[in-house]
């Protein structure tokens, strides 16, 4: 490694580092708009020869300049990123990579979780995916027809409640997976509790966390970009997320049908629903439920959040169950400190 220098790239404050990084990303035909919070680079003099980034505990944007492919720089980048995760106490980590890189990452201790023609989804460390599947089997309920819903519930609305009721009428037991990723207006903990409260009066319902394995920053990061997402990228990610559910989540709980809401508002969620249908094929049933409307408009969490941010109680209080309203009020979640995103 004589002559090479490894250093952190401060993309948000070093214009030259950002330019070097963007040039290398574009040469590799990768998006330079990826969300990253830590980036390193290996320089050969003034030339950026290799780079890699972290987005939380996800390794991404791993690129080696074509002229340096024989220099083993990728290993140096990956090991430096893993060391950073060790320093932060993050013992469970993920990587998206191309299928050709499977042997390389397996040699570094990564386990293959799922794959599509374009992508591999791999994991290293603990707690692992197998630990999560074991957790799910502990909550398994014997039923003739198990169904599932995955929801962000940001917050839990009457539309979510309607989806749950419609699903329950078509299955014996319903598993509701609440998105665990903390990148929403309301925290993962608050959203989980709102869902629990919102379905507490219903029999044959089990509420579970999705952890990192359903609609997460690891499996489907485009979901959190909404209208800013590249739909072609979202399609590839959605296919992988769907495969994880089909191959592992559904069998662990003997889920036969998944319910989703019809999606007239979000192109990314629409892409996701299409990917589910394609991935499930004849193996799993996918039922699309028409959205509940009020005053000629679909009841959506986006609509509720906009009204909350505008301070218009009358515009949102009738769009959520009493349980959601009481939870938001009791936890003082109407203040500015709760806002993790702006409604655009």
Regions found by a protein language model. Name each.
Residues 59-70:
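A short, internal acetyl-CoA/4′-phosphopantetheine-binding micro-motif in the GNAT/acyltransferase core
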Residues 85-98:
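Conserved GNAT acetyl-CoA-binding A-motif
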Residues 96-344:
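Nucleotidyltransferase catalytic core that binds NTPs
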Residues 1-32:
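Short amphipathic alpha-helix that is part of the acyltransferase structural core
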Residues 36-50:
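Conserved beta-hairpin
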Residues 37, 59, 144:
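Short coil/loop residues immediately preceding or within conserved phosphate-binding loops
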Residues 70-83, 107, 160-165:
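Conserved acetyl-CoA-binding loop-helix of GNAT-fold acetyltransferases
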